A protein has these predicted regions:
Chain C
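Non-cytosolic membrane-interface motifs at loop->transmembrane helix junctions
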Residues: 60-63, 105-109, 171-180
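Core mid-bundle transmembrane helix pairs that form the ion/substrate translocation pathway
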Residues: 214-215
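Short aromatic-rich membrane-water interface segments that cap or initiate transmembrane helices
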Residues: 67-75, 103, 174-183
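C-terminal edge-of-domain segments
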Residues: 172, 183-186, 200-201, 205
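Short helix-perturbing small/polar motifs within transmembrane alpha-helices
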Residues: 2-60, 75-167, 192-205, 209
Length: 294, 286, 215
């Protein structure tokens, strides 16, 4: 797979800030990958997301060094509106993303900006409505629906533009667990059915860990760790040092590993963890008396 | 229920069968009618007609309660302006003398004419606001090919107004949670304290501007450059069709206006001399 | 390679008024989506705040004893240049409409509102007054422009508009002139100074702040 994103020695310092928000970032993301980005607050995750979408430096004042390339071209080299055809961003606050009167208008807005025709819009509208389960909400004002529904609308609105890269900046931070799961269900479908490159910035790793192909750890503007997901979570001590809270099931098995009860691959999901525990218990269980019948 | 600019209208209302352009045309043209009608009875009849349209459209007539104090105060201001503050005019007929102030018949007549003119203008606007959803206004504007950026600014402004109102409630509740409430306090106190609301409201809106701009850019919207010249599909217009009935209504409104002008300037209708209301008022005051 | 570094020396607290309004050599200030958004937001805020004033303290025909919308009109124009002037011209039309002022009367008020928004914005830029109101001169410029612009509005609207529409007698025009003038100046005294003092320091750092007229 050819790289779709290439970041070379990239640093960004906002005007009036003493320290750079991102410092010396080098990163390559292959097309079609599902990448998770984690890090404590203030680590530069959102700055990175904005840098990939061209919002930095076009909308923010600061000092940039290095290069951010999308499909081999620097983000600043794209004319206004062109990069957004390739890179879509879903922000953490769905309320702040809505400028239309109805959910349908919200979904259609991006497609109209692309210059699509009415039949094309209709077709894509049907597709994203089905994907994100929004059929019953189309006539409603977007600010009158629930938080989870809002975030699905925001996701669908960006998806309707069929960007090659989708970036979701803490899409579930304001949602309850049920709504969070529904958003991730959409992401699961996207991963299975589409070939978008998906980058998710999240604090909550319960759902992200099982979906991501690769994980990135940012801290204080620096890229501390980048690896395939299983290998990423093997570096548990580094993650814990940097304030990352892996899923509880994963932490539990890690403790068993530290105690010497388990030495295989770290599980990413509760089901995998249950399988690990079953294996551990089976090994520890003393052999019982041979059963006899008759 | 469908939310209009001034409240809610049931989904079954006949007003939704009317194309938004017709509603806008009605507002623009019918607002002019009173300017050419001097006879108060005709203007009052127009006002009743508009109220009747509101009732037919199944608008919740309680929305009119907001305007009752304003209508009364405006009427008081007009009558005071014309009578008590009307000056000394020996050439006018004296209708009464109250506390040393001359009240002239011509001033009472003129005040009645002006007040009767204002009322249908106000209710034409109220009718429009109470039967038009935000989307309708956008569609009406797009139907007459007003540039997209203008209609979009208008839509965002409406959205912003809603958010400011929500923010106001939040800020007010936050202040109340700190034991700070304006209820039952004097006007100067309230004015001083509203300043404390304005600052966070402005600050919230400024922060929101950055988020809105990012959201627009993320959806590929551009104000300048090639992306701004993209031909837009105007998908929202596909939900509305300008039918023969709409054409008839538009024509009827236009013809009514033309007929009004012909009757007014060609045949002297709607003038004061022909007004039975003015004749009755004069008799009553004599 | 360093890019997009505004060469504004020092922290915003140390900037002079001259520096606030001056565009540095090489400084790029493109007109963008943010300005459209600011325009829309100012119209929205003004619509709510103006309608509050129109409904709460009415004299009649959109003239008010205490018009809170003046703050959005004038402070918005100082901060955001032509976008603020445009918003300040447009939003009273809507706030008056909701308050019951007839369509064509609201339309006829447009020149008055345009001048009320334009004059403070022009004066601050022309005289390089500090929007943070750091000196007596800044206060004086603001006060003077508030008075002059409201005086124009007060003459235009009752005299030209309301008298022209036949809604007022000649003798009652002074009441409405003073009502318009007083309603704007008093509300401006209450809100403009405090808003500028409290928020200008933040606003001038944002990309939406307009140094010239459009960006």
């Amino acid at each position: 797979m050819a790289p779709i994103i290439e970041i070379q020695n990239y640093s960004w310092r906002y005007s009036y800030a003493k320290m750079p928000a991102l410092n010396g970032i080098n990163l390559i993301i292959e097309e079609g990958a599902f990448v998770g980005i984690i890090g404590p607050n203030g680590s530069g995750k959102t700055t990175l997301a904005y840098s990939l979408d061209g919002l930095i430096p076009s909308q923010y004042r600061g000092i940039k060094q290095g290069a951010v390339n999308i499909l081999g071209r620097e983000v600043e080299a794209y004319p206004a509106g062109a990069l957004q055809k390739l890179v879509g961003v879903v922000f953490s606050d769905p309320e702040a993303q809505f400028t239309a009167m109805t959910v349908e208008d919200e979904l259609v807005f991006g497609m109209e900006n692309l210059g699509l025709s009415v039949p094309e819009i209709r077709e894509r509208l049907e597709w994203v409505t089905e994907l994100a389960e929004l059929g019953h909400l189309l006539e409603k004002p977007p600010y009158e629906i629930s938080g989870g529904q809002k975030q699905r609308v925001a996701l669908a609105a960006v998806l309707a533009m069929t960007p090659r890269v989708m970036i979701l900046d803490e899409p579930t931070s304001m949602l309850d667990p049920v709504s969070r799961k529904r958003v991730f269900d959409v992401l699961v479908r996207l991963k299975e059915e589409q070939r978008n490159t998906i980058i998710v910035i999240e604090h909550n790793l319960e759902n992200l860990a099982s979906l991501a192909d690769r994980m990135i750890l940012l801290s204080n503007g620096e890229l501390l760790l980048e690896d395939e997901t299983h290998a990423f979570f093997e570096k548990m001590d580094l993650l814990l040092e940097n304030g990352i809270h892996p899923p509880g099931a994963m932490l539990f098995i890690h403790r068993l590993m530290q105690e010497g009860y388990y030495a295989s691959r770290l599980p990413l999901t509760v089901d995998e963890a249950a399988a690990c525990l079953t294996e551990v218990v089976a090994r520890l269980k003393p052999p019982g008396p041979a059963s006899s019948r008759g | 229920m469908n939310k209009t600019l001034l409240g809610y209208v049931p989904e079954q209302s006949p007003i939704y069968a009317v194309h938004p352009f017709v509603k806008l045309f009605f507002l623009l043209v019918v607002s002019l009618f009173p300017m050419f009608i001097a006879s108060p009875e005709w203007n009052l009849a127009l006002m009743l007609f508009i109220l009747g349209l509101m009732w037919l459209s199944r608008v919740d007539m309680r929305v009119l309660r907001i305007y009752v104090p304003m209508v009364i105060s405006m009427g008081s201001v007009i009558f005071l302006s014309y009578t008590v503050l009307g000056g000394v005019h020996p050439e006018f007929g004296l209708a009464a003398r109250i506390a040393g102030v001359n009240i002239y018949w011509e001033r009472i007549r003129d005040a009645s004419v002006v007040y009767a003119r204002i009322l249908p203008m106000i209710f034409t606007m109220v009718f429009f606001l109470s039967t038009s959803r935000e989307r309708d206004v956008i569609v009406a504007m797009r139907s007459v090919r007003i540039p997209f950026v203008v209609t979009y600014v208008f839509a965002m402004a409406l959205r912003a107004a809603g958010m400011v109102l929500e923010d106001f409630q939040i800020v007010r509740q936050a202040e109340q949670a700190r034991g700070f409430d304006t209820a039952g306090k004097s006007i100067p106190y309230r004015i001083r304290k509203y300043v404390m609301y304005m600052i966070p409201l402005f600050a919230l809106s400024l922060r929101r501007s950055e988020e809105f701009a990012n959201a627009l850019l993320a959806r590929g919207y551009a104000f300048t450059g090639e992306a701004s010249r993209v031909k837009r599909a105007d998908y929202v217009l596909t939900h509305y069709s300008f039918r023969p009935a709409d054409l008839l209504l538009t024509a009827a409104i236009g013809l009514a206006f033309a007929a009004l002008l012909v009757l007014r300037f060609g045949f002297g209708y709607f003038e004061l001399e022909r007004s039975w209301f003015i004749a009755w008022l004069k008799t009553a005051l004599d | 390679m360093a890019t997009h570094a505004p060469s504004i020396p020092g922290a915003p607290g140390k900037m002079t008024a001259e520096q606030i309004w001056s565009v540095e050599a090489g400084e790029r200030r493109p007109v963008g989506v943010i300005h459209i958004v600011i325009l829309a937001l100012l119209i929205g805020i003004g619509f709510v705040v103006g309608a509050f004033g129109s409904i709460s303290f009415p004299l009649g025909f959109g003239v008010n004893f205490f018009w809170t919308g003046i703050a959005v009109q004038q402070v918005g124009a100082i901060w955001f240049g032509a976008w603020g002037v445009l918003a300040g011209t447009i939003f009273p039309f809507f706030s008056n409409a909701v308050a019951g002022t007839p369509f064509y009367i609201s339309l006829a008020y447009v020149p008055a509102n345009a001048v009320q928004a334009f004059l403070p914005a022009w004066a601050f830029r022309f005289f390089k007054a500090d929007p943070r109101l750091q000196s007596g001169r800044d206060y004086l410029i603001l006060l003077a422009t508030m008075i002059v612009s409201s005086a124009f509005g007060a003459l235009w609207s009752p005299l030209v508009v309301l008298r022209g529409f036949g809604l007022l007698t000649t003798e009652s025009v002074p009441l409405f002139i003073w009502g318009w003038f007083g309603g704007n100046v008093i509300a401006g005294l209450v809100f403009n100074f405090i808003l500028l003092k409290a928020l200008s320091g933040v606003v001038i750092r944002t990309p939406s702040f307009v140094k010239r007229w459009l960006s």
